Amino acid sequence: MARIAGVNIPTNKRVLIALTYIHGIGRAKATEITTSLGIPAERRVNQLTDDEVLKIRELIDRDFQVEGDLRRAVAMNIKRLMDLGCYRGLRHRRGLPVHGQRTHTNARTRKGPAKPIAGKKKVTK
Amino acid sequence: MARSVWKGPFLDGYMLGKADKARASGRNEVIKIWSRRSTILPQFVGLTFGVYNGQKFIPVLVTENMIGHKFGEFSPTRTFYGHAVDKKAKRK
């Protein structure tokens, strides 16, 4: 059990993998952290010494934006676009894809589940 | 991919002249522009541009936040009024 960057308690997985449970840290940053601290790849979180945990915590605090701060930063960026009244902001407001994808079909990630169209007959056999 | 820094921001050359003239005249009237692809520069802040959207000129008051965006981003070219509700639709 180790608390790193607030609420995250990665389990008895390898350190490299456990760190990716933190929002804002993926494989690339996890590799960066472990190599710069010289933690061997096969080391698991429950085998970390208190000193190493402390070092990881400090490194993340110093170099990376994670969890709440990162979420807030992303939300602020989106809010800025929306307040600006630019095209990307309008797309965010309407919940449509922002990067110019087609919306004739697909785009279900942004639009959510398909809504039934009134009056359209179902093809039944 | 982002534009190379060494090229500097893109804009059509006559934009600067237009902006200067508008500043010199003092009155804040809408500057009509067709160049939607030009970058908004710091010296445009406070001016109002009429950005052409293919049909009419959409007035855009340039604020500090807009620096780095393109003029076209603030002048939507499409209108979508939503889908009309079909009155003949029957409930089954």
UniProtKB/Swiss-Prot annotation, chain B:
InterPro entries given in the database record: Ribosomal_uS19 (IPR002222), Ribosomal_uS19_bac-type (IPR005732), Ribosomal_uS19_CS (IPR020934), Ribosomal_uS19_SF (IPR023575)
SUPFAM superfamilies tied to this protein: Ribosomal protein S19 (SSF54570)
Entry keyword annotation includes Ribosomal protein: yes
Entries under Pfam families matching the protein: Ribosomal_S19
Keyword Cell membrane annotated: no
Keywords, comma-separated and alphabetical: Ribonucleoprotein, Ribosomal protein, RNA-binding, rRNA-binding
Residues making up the signal peptide according to the UniProt record: none
Function statement: Protein S19 forms a complex with S13 that binds strongly to the 16S ribosomal RNA.
NCBIfam families listed in its UniProt record: rpsS_bact
Family as reported in the entry's similarity comment: Belongs to the universal ribosomal protein uS19 family.
Protein name (database record): Small ribosomal subunit protein uS19
Organism whose genome encodes this protein: Paramagnetospirillum magneticum (strain ATCC 700264 / AMB-1) (Magnetospirillum magneticum)
